[in-house]
């Protein structure tokens, strides 16, 4: 699984902790963030995590699942990660605000498979999990 634009490691670090059998790649283009992630992987320890400092456009591994949180519009996520996803893979995008305009954007080779509203304890704001699949 790839957590791209990992930032502080969300959701990649909690997923790796909850599923130690899951190989997780934490990808970010910001070296300060990847140094922080590397230290977390060492300290926790999380042997199932690999931290990669690279731009998503330049990275070339292939994954069955890609997760993203607070990155950008769905169309941008689909465009930037299309080359990293297997033919039957899926992108799991965590979104806060989700409006009709974004849901009807051209997603290129992708389509929206599901939109699930999430309930976050102690948070009175909308959150969604959008699953994208290749057409």
Model regions and ranges:
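Conserved SAM/SAH cofactor-binding pocket of Class I
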Residues: 1-68, 78-79
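Short beta->alpha hinge that forms the Motif I/post-I loop of the SAM-binding pocket
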Residues: 28-32, 73, 96
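Helix-to-beta-strand junctions that scaffold the AdoMet/dcAdoMet cofactor pocket
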Residues: 19, 85-87
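Conserved beta-strand signature within the Rossmann-like core of class I S-adenosyl-L-methionine
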Residues: 88-98
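Internal catalytic or translocation cores that form aromatic/hydrophobic pockets or channels
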Residues: 75, 81-83
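Short, conserved active-site loop motifs that form the nucleotide-linked donor/cofactor pocket
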Residues: 49, 89, 113
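Short glycine-rich, flexible loops that bind phosphorylated cofactors or substrates
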Residues: 74-75, 100
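Active-site capping/gating segments
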Residues: 25, 96-135
């Amino acid at each position: 699984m790839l957590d791209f634009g990992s930032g502080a490691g969300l959701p990649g670090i909690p997923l790796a902790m909850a599923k130690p059998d899951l190989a997780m790649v934490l990808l970010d283009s910001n070296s300060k963030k990847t140094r922080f992630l590397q230290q977390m992987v060492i300290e926790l320890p999380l042997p199932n995590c690999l931290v990669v400092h690279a731009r998503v456009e330049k990275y070339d591994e292939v994954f069955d699942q890609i997760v993203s949180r607070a990155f950008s519009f769905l169309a941008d996520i689909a465009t930037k990660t299309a080359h990293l996803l297997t033919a039957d893979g899926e992108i799991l995008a965590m979104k806060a605000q989700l409006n009709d305009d974004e849901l009807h954007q051209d997603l290129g080779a992708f389509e929206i498979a599901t939109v699930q509203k999430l309930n976050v304890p102690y948070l009175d704001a909308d959150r969604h999990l959008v699953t994208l699949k290749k057409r």
